[in-house]
């Protein structure tokens, strides 16, 4: 599995960059924000999400870990694929997007190409609680993703996250949350 690329940017378009790494050129899907920061002929370091489908092997590239985490979370929402997730990241930084979700600005989300009212509402509902505004945020986001990957619902997870002590390590928080969810 490819998780990162360090190489020279060979070619850039709005949503794709070609990165040459030791004689091999990789086509990487990127947001418009990322493509604007890349320069042809310059060295780049991208965090990669590799998606393997029946008909395609895709590489998505990100300059920031926060973009990659948000992209992965968006892909878990039914109706959101790579194209729409990249459109969101092209329109908003992760912090701007977090603010839109926190303030429930459905209309702003609908301005993203490919997102109508129904999908905007679904994204809002699915991401409520994913962004937490306090010092335990990084730990809570990791716990949220771990529990969600185990099949727990967002509402259940959010309820448990509110009860966790802020000083717990991520592993301890996951264990505590699992105990609460299974009782």
Swiss-Prot record:
InterPro entries found in the cross-reference section: DNA_helicase_Holl-junc_RuvA_I, Hlx-hairpin-Hlx_DNA-bd_motif, NA-bd_OB-fold, RuvA, RuvA_2-like, RuvA_C, RuvA_C_sf
Record's protein name: Holliday junction branch migration complex subunit RuvA
A GO term from the CC aspect: Holliday junction helicase complex
Compartments where found: Cytoplasm
Job description of the protein: The RuvA-RuvB-RuvC complex processes Holliday junction (HJ) DNA during genetic recombination and DNA repair, while the RuvA-RuvB complex plays an important role in the rescue of blocked DNA replication forks via replication fork reversal (RFR). RuvA specifically binds to HJ cruciform DNA, conferring on it an open structure. The RuvB hexamer acts as an ATP-dependent pump, pulling dsDNA into and through the RuvAB complex. HJ branch migration allows RuvC to scan DNA until it finds its consensus sequence, where it cleaves and resolves the cruciform DNA.
Gene3D superfamilies: 5' to 3' exonuclease, C-terminal subdomain, DNA helicase RuvA subunit, C-terminal domain, Nucleic acid-binding proteins
CDD domains: UBA_RuvA_C (cd14332)
Region feature (Domain II): 64-141
Quaternary structure (record): Homotetramer. Forms an RuvA(8)-RuvB(12)-Holliday junction (HJ) complex. HJ DNA is sandwiched between 2 RuvA tetramers; dsDNA enters through RuvA and exits via RuvB. An RuvB hexamer assembles on each DNA strand where it exits the tetramer. Each RuvB hexamer is contacted by two RuvA subunits (via domain III) on 2 adjacent RuvB subunits; this complex drives branch migration. In the full resolvosome a probable DNA-RuvA(4)-RuvB(12)-RuvC(2) complex forms which resolves the HJ.
Organism: Helicobacter pylori (strain Shi470)
Highest classification ranks of the organism: Bacteria, Pseudomonadati, Campylobacterota, Epsilonproteobacteria, Campylobacterales
């Amino acid at each position: 599995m490819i998780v990162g690329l360090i190489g020279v940017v060979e070619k850039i378009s709005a949503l794709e960059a070609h990165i040459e790494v030791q004689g091999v050129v990789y086509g990487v899907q990127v947001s418009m924000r990322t493509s604007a920061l890349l320069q042809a002929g310059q060295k780049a370091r991208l965090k990669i999400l590799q998606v393997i489908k029946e008909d395609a092997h895709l590489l998505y590239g990100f300059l920031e870990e926060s973009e990659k985490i948000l992209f992965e979370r968006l892909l878990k929402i039914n109706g959101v694929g790579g194209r729409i997730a990249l459109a969101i990241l092209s329109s908003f930084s992760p912090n701007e997007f977090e603010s839109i979700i926190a303030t429930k600005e459905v209309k702003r989300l609908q301005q993203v190409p490919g997102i109508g009212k129904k999908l905007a509402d679904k994204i809002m509902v699915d991401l409520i609680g994913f962004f937490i505004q306090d010092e335990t945020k990084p730990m809570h986001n990791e716990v949220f993703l771990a529990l969600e990957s185990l099949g727990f619902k967002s509402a259940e997870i959010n309820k448990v996250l509110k009860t966790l002590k802020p000083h717990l390590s991520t592993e301890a928080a996951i264990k505590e949350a699992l105990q609460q969810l299974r009782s």
